[in-house]
A protein has these predicted regions:
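P-loop NTPase motor module signature
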Residues: 1-258
Length: 258
């Protein structure tokens, strides 16, 4: 199977405007108590308001605040934010992250993976016609742009870990900015999520798209759990053994001969 063989499958078609609110509200499950304790949940109204107001919304928040798991759900469940014939896609720079996040969110919502929440990585598509939220690698979305230049099947594209600045993400941001500035994606909302406070740089990059009335980046303070940095020396101390560095002598090393 080619990586670009499968499309992002939207919902079951267009519905009348008067039915959109009812359909979304009835279909959205109650968020779990664990999700409601996340710092992101406390800022949910600000987050949704920012996405409604802006074409491109920039969100920053500490690692562990719930950006990757909760914001895609909030967007998917919000009333009249994403049309029922379109999906919400959240990109991840790595395949493992796309899979584990999709599994966690599906389990948190009490659903089977591939039903309302799914994922798409190279050669593997785990979603159905009922899927509303798809976690996908950034490379997959780039391939989608090649076959679907205006991303008509996507209502909101969330680009996570944008601060990592890998080549796929940078290229995707460039293509999106040019397409939206030229009016080729009038239906699309874009959300950029960063774990650093340099969100203003990304907001400035998309100023041409958002215009002068754009809201400032949304910052989510706080994290659920403390994050500590550990290094190689710490691991050596824990296990009571430190492998000899390559090139420092020993059987397999390239140290100087005596």
């Amino acid at each position: 199977m080619r990586a670009d063989a499968a499309s992002f499958v939207p919902g079951k078609g267009l519905v009348a405007d008067s039915e959109v609110t009812k359909t979304r509200r009835d279909a959205a499950p109650e968020l779990s108590e664990a999700a409601k304790r996340l710092p992101t949940y406390q800022k949910k109204d600000w987050v949704i308001a920012g996405i409604r107001h802006n074409v491109v919304t920039v969100i920053s928040g500490d690692t562990g605040c719930g950006k990757s798991t909760l914001i895609p759900q909030l967007v998917c469940d919000a009333e009249n934010l994403v049309a029922d014939d379109k999906v919400v896609v959240c990109t991840q720079p790595r395949r493992v992250a796309a899979i584990t996040l999709a599994e966690y969110v599906a389990r948190d919502r009490g659903q089977e993976l591939g039903d309302e929440v799914g994922y798409q990585i190279r050669f593997i598509n785990k979603f159905s016609e009922n899927t509303r939220l798809i976690y996908a690698t950034t490379a997959i979305v780039l391939r989608r742009l090649h076959s679907e230049p205006t991303l008509d099947s996507i209502g909101c594209l969330i680009i996570d870990e944008v601060h990592e600045r890998d080549v796929y993400t940078d290229f995707l941001l460039l293509l999106l900015r040019e397409a939206m500035a030229n009016g080729r994606m009038p239906h699309l909302k874009i959300v950029l999520m960063s774990a650093t406070l340099k969100a203003e740089d990304f907001a400035q990059y998309f100023r041409k798209v958002n215009g002068d009335t754009a809201l400032k980046p949304v910052h989510i303070p706080g994290r659920m759990f403390p994050v500590e940095d550990y290094y190689w020396e710490d691991a050596c101390e824990w296990i009571g053994f430190c492998p000899q560095e390559k090139g420092k002598g020993g059987k397999g090393g390239k140290g100087k001969k005596g």
